[in-house]
Amino acid sequence: MSFHITPIWMWKGTGNNYAYLLTCDKTKITAIVDPAEPESVIPVIKEKTAKKEIDLQYILTTHHHYDHAGGNEDILSYFPSLKVYGGKNASGVTYTPKDKEIFKVGEVQVEALHTPCHTQDSICYYVSSPSKRAVFTGDTLFTSGCGRFFEGDAKQMDYALNHVLAALPDDTVTYPGHEYTKSNAKFSSTIFSTPELTKLVDFCKNHESTTGHFTIGDEKKFNPFMCLGLESVQKAVGSSDPITVMKKLRDMKNAA
């Protein structure tokens, strides 16, 4: 069953977070992903509900950090019947899906993919229908980048990006938790050069928002954190061991 996704930009100019509405086209049943800033998301929810464009039933939380889960309790005060999916450490959570557990939003299939590293409760949500695929990656995968290893290490991030997410179909559209693409692409350009990365840099010059425009297949071509085996990336960090490459890339990005 088909679906559509509506990004909501929060804390624009500071945190530059995204919440997302995931709506089943047939039933209008909707989940909202990481609605951390109620002031930004509640008016959108109310307007779309009044127009009968959505039937909000779920919150999907990618991890427990305040700028992702901190709005859950406030949202619940307005919409107390919502089911809140996420890690057990996240505010307001009523259900923690197991790794690779499948559930439905309306008639749309969603799979919870545990990707511990940025936090140990990080979950990506893979959405699929016969016609298209998408994944909400929180602070695990950013466009041409990845999250900091606050609660994990390079080995965990390598597994999350290059085993779990890389195994998704290449046409899976990515929806990260922040708008960091311009700075990520700038850093990536100091590591290696590909035609796809050049196009991404150009895209950022003309588009303030980049979420929903790129895919897992694109990430494999312009994200150095997903190109650990590429000779140019290995040369940039001085190692060919994938875990060491991942760690050095993250250290370099942190210092950039």
Curated annotation (Swiss-Prot):
The keyword Repeat does not apply. Gene3D superfamilies: Ribonuclease Z/Hydroxyacylglutathione hydrolase-like. GO terms for biological process: cellular detoxification; methylglyoxal catabolic process to D-lactate via S-lactoyl-glutathione. Its cofactor is Zn(2+). Pathway: Secondary metabolite metabolism; methylglyoxal degradation; (R)-lactate from methylglyoxal: step 2/2. Its EC number is 3.1.2.6. It is found in: Cytoplasm; Nucleus. Zn(2+) 2 binds at D67, H68, D139, H178. It holds the Pfam family HAGH_C. One of its GO terms (cellular component) is cytosol. Keywords: Cytoplasm, Hydrolase, Metal-binding, Nucleus, Zinc. The keyword NAD does not apply. One of its GO terms (molecular function) is hydroxyacylglutathione hydrolase activity. Belongs to the metallo-beta-lactamase superfamily. Glyoxalase II family. Thiolesterase that catalyzes the hydrolysis of S-D-lactoylglutathione to form glutathione and D-lactic acid. Involved in the metabolism of methylglyoxal, a toxic compound for yeast proliferation, by converting methylglyoxal to lactate via S-D-lactoylglutathione by sequential enzyme reactions catalyzed by glyoxalase I and glyoxalase II. This is Probable hydroxyacylglutathione hydrolase glo2. It comes from Schizosaccharomyces pombe (strain 972 / ATCC 24843) (Fission yeast). The lineage of its organism: Eukaryota, Fungi, Dikarya, Ascomycota, Taphrinomycotina. The gene is glo2.
